[in-house]
Amino acid sequence: MKKIAFLISLAFASAANAGNTTVTLTADNEFWLYSGNAAGTNLVLRGEGHSWPTAFNFSFDVNAGDYLYVAARDQGGPQAWQAAISAPVGALYSNINSWKYIVSPNNNVSQAGVAANVAAGGWANPLAQTDYNASPWGARVNDPNAKWIWHDTLGLANGWNDPSSSDGTYAIFRTNDAVAAIPEPSTYAMMIGGLAMLAALRRRKTAA
């Protein structure tokens, strides 16, 4: 029975740990990448970058029901970020259709600060994007599916000095959907049923 209980716990743990995610990401001017649930109560910092000409690469495991969060901060001039992602649910990219955003009321980019903003909610759809190789940034993640995006304006007007409403603070972008699906109840039922059959066969063999 101890072995069966161990197998059951192992099966549940495997279902909860949904799989590997790889992210190639950059932002003008800097970013912090998190994963966690929709409420932001278990955010994990996965990486950060502070040089927009550089595409940063990250690889990590996500849990079932996890979303990805990009906290991005501009320091003046044009503003945007770009990403190509491989997740358990498939390929994801930076574009205005796959993400939502909120603007922080302060400049606290600590994990606690980001979590507080996520908990406050108020998500909206981002408005601004341009092609992956657009000026002044060029193709940093080298994938034509990855747009340069921002929540209100890319800041390309007025000599690349069009202000954003998040100037002086920062914006948080979250995937529309979880990047690792939560297993259906039937999946757990099938796992338990299969293990129960193994237990019954084991008992029958022992009795024989």
Residue positions per predicted region:
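Residue-level detector of intrinsically disordered/flexible regions characterized by low predicted structural confidence
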Residues: 4-5, 207
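Short, threonine-centered small-residue motifs that mark membrane-proximal processing/anchoring sites
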Residues: 5-20, 176-195, 201
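Short N-terminal segments immediately surrounding and downstream of signal-peptide cleavage
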Residues: 21-30
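Accessory carbohydrate-binding/adhesion or oligomerization-edge regions at the termini
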Residues: 26, 63, 69-180
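Beta-strand-rich ligand-recognition modules
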Residues: 30-84, 115
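C-terminal membrane-anchoring or membrane-association module
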Residues: 199-208
